[in-house]
Curated annotation (Swiss-Prot):
The gene is cyp2. Gene3D superfamilies: Cyclophilin-like (2.40.100.10). Belongs to the cyclophilin-type PPIase family. PPIase A subfamily. It comes from Rhizopus delemar (strain RA 99-880 / ATCC MYA-4621 / FGSC 9543 / NRRL 43880). This is Peptidyl-prolyl cis-trans isomerase A1. The lineage of its organism: Eukaryota, Fungi, Fungi incertae sedis, Mucoromycota, Mucoromycotina. It is found in: Cytoplasm. GO terms for biological process: protein folding.
Length: 164
């Protein structure tokens, strides 16, 4: 079976930026990939649609996925509140890596980040579970709206999302 592909249609201050397509590595991290896939489809009654990228740091990453508090303090997984680190097989090798944000070991929920550079210092701390396959131009546009402290200079929203 092939790995699932999902998408985000993203806007900044209500202006469409385009689509980001991501391949989820269910072959390596099936539980983590399934969590993200189901949050993209919203099939459990909650998910990423309408959620923001609340933290954007140029030359580092874009972070989103807090659909409960909308500020980086919330979110939840399809397995309950938090779930364990599945494995650290995949590494942060360059721009476009999709990885779980966390608050320490075994605290994965719904928050994720997309890297804009190689982030090898995060290997063994954050679970990489996919990669951007289309729309790196959209990722770069979002990155350009970031700031050194992470506060975006625009309201960046996932207007629609799902599985392809």
């Amino acid at each position: 079976m092939s790995n699932p592909k999902v998408f985000f249609d993203v806007s900044a201050n209500s202006k469409p930026l385009g689509r980001i397509v991501m391949e989820l590595r269910a072959d390596v991290v099936p539980q983590t990939a399934e969590n993200f896939r189901a949050l993209c489809t919203g099939e459990k009654g909650f998910g990423y649609k309408g959620c923001s990228f609340h933290r954007v740091i140029p030359e580092f990453m874009l972070q989103g996925g807090d659909f409960t508090n909308h500020n980086g303090t919330g979110g939840k997984s399809i397995y309950g509140n938090k779930f364990r680190d599945e494995n650290f097989t995949l590494k942060h090798t360059g721009p476009g890596d999709l990885s779980m944000a966390n608050a320490g070991p075994n605290t994965n929920g719904s928050q994720f980040f997309i890297t804009t550079i190689k982030c090898s210092w995060l290997d063994g701390k954050h679970v990489v579970f996919g990669r951007v396959t289309e729309g790196m131009d959209v990722v770069q546009n979002i990155e350009s709206l970031g700031s050194p402290n992470g506060t975006p200079r625009a309201k960046i929203i996932i207007d629609n999302c799902g599985q392809l």
